[in-house]
């Protein structure tokens, strides 16, 4: 079981995902959502993040942490 926790402004994020692919997809959906609120985050940055989180999930190098801004951060871990 994979778990995503984080903060999106005032919203607390807590999601459980059964498969690694689903966890990566949900994680990146939140990253994509957060990109709408940042000026210095590009599509290339999102691709780099997708590569990083996928690598960490499949090499079991978790938790994976990502911060878009101080108000928006995510952590993916395996329970």
Give the residues covered by each predicted segment.
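Short aromatic-glycine-(Arg/Gly/Cys) micro-motifs in beta-strand/loop hairpins
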Residues: 1-12, 26-30
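Short, mixed-charge low-complexity intrinsically disordered segments
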Residues: 29-79
């Amino acid at each position: 079981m994979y778990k995503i926790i984080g903060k999106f402004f005032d919203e607390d994020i807590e999601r459980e995902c059964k498969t690694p692919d689903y966890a990566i997809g949900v994680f990146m959906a939140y990253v994509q959502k957060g990109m709408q609120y940042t000026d210095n985050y590009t599509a290339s940055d999102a691709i780099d993040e997708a590569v990083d989180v996928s690598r960490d999930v499949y090499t079991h190098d978790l938790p994976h942490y990502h911060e878009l801004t101080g108000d928006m951060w995510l952590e993916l871990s395996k329970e």
